[in-house]
Amino acid sequence: MSKPSNTPPLPKDGERNILITSALPYVNNVPHLGNIIGCVLSADVYARYCRLKNYNCIYICGTDEYGTATETKALSEGCTPKEICDKYHEIHKEIYEWFNISFDKFGRTSTNSQTEIAQDIFNKIKDNGYTLTQEIEQLYCEQTCKMFLADRFVEGTCPHCKFEDARGDQCDGCSKLLNPTELINPRCKVCSKPPVIKSTKHIFIDLPQLQQQVDQFVETNSKGGNWSENSIAITNTWVKGELKPRCITRDLKWGTPVPMEEFKDKVFYVWFDAPIGYISITAEYTNEWEKWWKNPENVKLVQFMGKDNVPFHTVIFPASLIGSKDNYTLLNNLSTTEFLNYETGKFSKSRNTGVFGDGAKATGIPSEVWRFYLLNNRPESSDSIFSWDDFNFKNNELLNNFGNLVNRVLKMLNTNAAFNGVVPKIGELNEVDKKLVQEVDEHLVQYFQKLEEISLKEGLKIAMSISKLGNTYMQDNKPWDLSGKDNERCGQVLAILINLIKLLSTLLEPYIPSLTDKVHQQLNVEPTKYSTHFDINAIPAGHEISKEILPLVKKIEADDLKKWRTKFSGIGPEFPIDMKIATVLEVNDHPSAENLYVIKLSLGGDQTKTAVSGIKANFEKSQLIGKKLAVVLNLKPSKFKGVLSEAMILVADDGQATKESLSFLVPSNPQSIEAGSKIAGKGMSIKPKPTIDYQKEFLHYDLTCIDKIISYNKSQLFINQNEPLVSEKIGNGKVR
């Protein structure tokens, strides 16, 4: 009953029409648990609640696909931005499906609808006089790339906290927003060369002209929309005093084109463009999207996001819509979360720290347990920390409180010969029964109040408190002792508990829908909408429950907890090979062997090594000079016809024994990689053995080339933990 409609709902006069959005996840990585609880999962609970209340609602989300992060990710993986977006859109979609996220539409921003709607909003803002153009100083890569560097194409030292790998738009060390020109010792992310400062013309949204309208919007909607204190504080840092013009264009190719001849080589900045994705994704869902997005009188817009996204949704996006003067539906309710951190620090895919969506699935723990844990620990007012001990504690709470209540009651009804799985008559209630009904009804009032306020964590606690009331009622009335002695009272207790379980399955459906589906199956009933009171006859006497009663939740074993804590701690498997990128300086014929080259390699700075290699039949000298390629440096040095070889050049071999059978292993983007750069799998601990015997050890390592991707023990190898190592020519083969 909390699932989306088969046909797109539209707003209706006289009904509650709620438009729900979750912050659009970016497509440059896999979502971690903090991303999931901060946006899509929280919005999913509220959307399911609204459907169970018979509110007219839709839940819209999708991948945010334009901007510098996509272009830089595409460079690092050696593919196009479109290919990156396709890949990560599917990854996100699969993870959210596994987590049972009930979008009405999960779309993407790289669509024609996005271009049309974003350009239309911009043109209206411009025509209404709310834009201006200014020349700004911007970093330009003059040595290699010959292009202006948008924010994420620049890295350097943060001027505030001195973090050395701050991005041009924000520092990951102190979270402060930055301009690229503020960085100390900036460097181009593509080629690592220092850029210069040049002037370039950009378009700004003239926020000072919109100040009064934005102030009024914030004043009215922050109070009426239940914004958190932190969200209001973050917004006020922007609007208190005086708003400043905000640049809305970037020197990029991957994005929504600016519809002006003078700026035809520029695209819209992601934080002007991305929130419009909510609108364009709705337009992909229904042709009548304007009935949702241009209907502020009848539609409430409820948006979910992490605290770092607040100012773009409370200032930039509303200001853009106000400036268009096109009667857009503006943000009403804002539900934000603080940060969820991992027990050993921040989530990091590259360092294998923390649980990401794909990792959660790989544990084999059902998604409902993850949902239950995350929603119990939703960081609503302060940052929270994921810990495996607490995860185990919450799993036991779900098992012992709700899971055992369902299992005990249904099994007792099935195994008692007096009932044989058929719900008994309840008859007249005694004072104990009436007290239970009264307490449950009081809890229901609180439950609905908290869900209306979008206090999701409190709503879950209240539902579990009702389950606890059921357990206490069962313990106090001891139906196992009544069986055979007073079957009428035994049946009455079980029938009341059966109906309490049905009520609980509806209350918990927004939180753990797959698990409550199982409860409905075992009760042999269809899901229903909410009831505002405890109906003890919702499942009538004479109804037969399922004969197959299975445990809903399993205990987590201590050994599994230990295994997962180690797996996600950032302590990866050891990589025993000293593998680096080298640049070929010289290639000479071996003085005593016709089939060998003697190759001089640079490993950065003044460090050089000599490699004697049997690749002469496959490559001309001219094909090697200046090439950046992978080498192994900890093989036992060997003499070949009197010449000492200190390194081995790696190749992929397709086994066909032709001149084209060998392929060098190279960076996917050689310009960005320096000689001496280390190679290993992400999250691996690089611990080279002092020496490796080629015949006895190296040939037995699982080094493979599949679809040009180089892997060790089925883990992809990267240069500097970021740049993929790939085969230059052949697609599949053995690495040697």
From Swiss-Prot:
Alphabetical GO CC annotations of the entry are: aminoacyl-tRNA synthetase multienzyme complex; cytoplasm; cytosol; methionyl glutamyl tRNA synthetase complex
Q: Which InterPro entries match?
A: aa-tRNA-synth_I_CS, Anticodon_Met, Met-tRNA_ligase_1, Met-tRNA_synth, Methionyl/Leucyl_tRNA_Synth, MetRS_core, MetRS_Zn, NA-bd_OB-fold
> Which keywords does UniProt give here?
Aminoacyl-tRNA synthetase, ATP-binding, Cytoplasm, Ligase, Nucleotide-binding, Protein biosynthesis, RNA-binding, tRNA-binding
Which residue ranges does the record assign to the tRNA-binding domain?
573-680
The cross-references to PROSITE patterns, in alphabetical order and at most eight, read: AA_TRNA_LIGASE_I, TRBD
Motif ('KMSKS' region) positions are: 346-350
Q: Name one GO molecular function term.
A: methionine-tRNA ligase activity
Q: Which SUPFAM superfamilies match?
A: Anticodon-binding domain of a subclass of class I aminoacyl-tRNA synthetases (SSF47323), Methionyl-tRNA synthetase (MetRS), Zn-domain (SSF57770), Nucleic acid-binding proteins (SSF50249), Nucleotidylyl transferase (SSF52374)
Keyword tRNA-binding attached:
yes
Q: What is its EC number?
A: 6.1.1.10
What's a BP term from Gene Ontology annotated to this protein? methionyl-tRNA aminoacylation
Which reaction is the catalytic activity of this chain? tRNA(Met) + L-methionine + ATP = L-methionyl-tRNA(Met) + AMP + diphosphate
Give the principal location in a single coarse category.
cytoplasm
Its localization reads: Cytoplasm
Answer yes or no on keyword Transport: no
Q: Under which main EC class is this enzyme filed?
A: ligase
- The record places the motif ('HIGH' region) at 25-35
What is the name of this protein? Probable methionine--tRNA ligase, cytoplasmic
- Which organism encodes this protein? Dictyostelium discoideum
Gene name linked to the record: metS
